[in-house]
Swiss-Prot record:
Its EC number is 2.3.2.27. Interacts with CD86. The gene is MARCHF8. Residues 25-39 have a biased composition (Basic and acidic residues). SMART domains: RINGv. Pathway: Protein modification; protein ubiquitination. Zn(2+) 2 binds at C95, C97, C121, C124. This is E3 ubiquitin-protein ligase MARCHF8. Gene3D superfamilies: Zinc/RING finger domain, C3HC4 (zinc finger). It comes from Bos taurus. The keyword Zinc applies. Residues 1-68 are annotated as: Disordered. Zn(2+) 1 binds at C78, C81, H105, C108. Residues 50-64 have a biased composition (Low complexity).
Amino acid sequence: MNMPLHQISAIPSQDATSARVYRSKTKEKEREEQNEKTLGHSMSHSSNISKAGGSSVASAPVSSFPRTSVTPSNQDICRICHCEGDDESPLITPCRCTGSLHFVHQTCLQQWIKSSDTRCCELCKYEFIMETKLKPLRKWEKLQMTSSERRKIMCSVTFHVIAITCVVWSLYVLIDRTAEEIRQGQATGILEWPFWTKLVVVAIGFTGGLLFMYVQCKVYVQLWRRLKAYNRVIYVQNCPETSKRNIFEKPALPEPNFESKDGRGVCHSDTNSSCCTEPEDTGAEIIHV
């Protein structure tokens, strides 16, 4: 029985390794080509987008873009109105806040204190050091009140004047009649019952009048305090800690260096010209003229 014959080819080891290297190189080349193709597609897509965007930007007018200041400002500004300080309204440091919240105008802070009715910073909770002063009398302003409040005050004042006049006149009449009865009683040695009745009525009327005047005077005192508070100016002092810190944090002025590093001479700078003076030769002879 004849068996089929298979041809077996023996390849040396060196040829096998070279074939493997060749295959790996071809695979790497194929991968690189694929990567280049994908990169080419993405670059072409991005270039198309950039061209479209560039054409739209070029077609847009220049005036359509808002003009904003990009340059940073190194000057201090008020944290309420965001304005700089000047000679008329300087900036103060009333609390321990730092950074952009460090400075504030005196007038802005006064208005904020009046509107919020607080005496401390809302951020660092530092109590302001305040000094109050009253305006001169000729500069006092009228208290802001409604017409109904003014009408009530005028009626109250008129009623009180009339009531005080009546009470004083009644007391004068009662005291005069009582004194006359006392003189008559001293003559007879007996005081009649109407005398004690009049005395009790006078005492009750006097006590009631005093209580009524006390209650009404409290209302007038409150109005007076409101008027004083309205014509009072509040000055907020600088925080002592921040003022000391600002003094210590001021940069020292650089001392002028009159000696050059190479020791050749002294350079003097001027706005119009600059010159360098050479050192004098110590060995030069002095010529007498």
